[in-house]
């Protein structure tokens, strides 16, 4: 893409390099806030590059955000491309939790069962108590069973260390990488 387009890589609030310990304590992340932040980036890009409309590419949670953005501000979006597109994140959360619980029961993983029962199933895509911490716990168990990427059973930290970190070292300072890792652990996205 970089050979043919100007790319703007953006970590939404609380994620990746946008993580701020102070902001993490005092900020409630909402759909509206995410959409307005993204729209501000679009407006900036339109002005900076003298374009009437912008092409948006969204990955993972960014694919949800991309759809929300295109829906609310179609006049600013030339095209939207979803990569790893989330189609029904509420159903996705339900299926993810159910699969993880089923695997824990099947494997007799008492520790995982205790964690999953404590956080309880999501309602409308959200865990009832401390959604961020609950989703991180659920995802850790999901990943342990290979549900996040069935071709790999490595813990996330190993994937980060051996796959993502060498790539990141080419573009980020060590301080930025530390901030990124903190942001990943803060944001469920």
Language-model segments: which ranges?
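Conserved alpha/beta-hydrolase
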Residues: 1-20
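Conserved acidic catalytic loop of the alpha/beta-hydrolase fold
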Residues: 33-53
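Alpha/beta-hydrolase
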Residues: 107-189
């Amino acid at each position: 893409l970089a050979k043919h387009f100007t790319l703007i890589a953006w970590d939404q609030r609380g994620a990746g390099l946008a993580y701020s310990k102070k902001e993490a304590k005092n900020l409630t992340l909402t759909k509206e806030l995410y959409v307005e932040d993204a729209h501000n980036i679009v407006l900036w890009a339109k002005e900076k590059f003298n374009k009437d409309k912008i092409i948006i590419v969204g990955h993972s949670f960014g694919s949800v955000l991309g759809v929300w953005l295109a829906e609310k501000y179609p006049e600013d979006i030339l095209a939207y491309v979803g990569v790893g597109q989330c189609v029904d994140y509420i159903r996705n959360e339900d299926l993810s939790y159910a699969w993880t619980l089923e695997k824990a029961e099947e494997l007799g993983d008492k520790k995982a069962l205790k964690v999953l029962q404590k956080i309880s199933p999501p309602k409308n895509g959200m865990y009832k108590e401390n959604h961020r911490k609950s989703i991180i716990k659920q995802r850790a168990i999901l990943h342990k069973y290979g549900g996040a990427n069935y071709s790999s059973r490595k813990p996330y930290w190993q994937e980060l260390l051996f796959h993502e970190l060498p790539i990141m070292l080419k573009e980020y300072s060590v301080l930025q990488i530390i901030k990124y890792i903190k942001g990943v652990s803060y944001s469920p996205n």
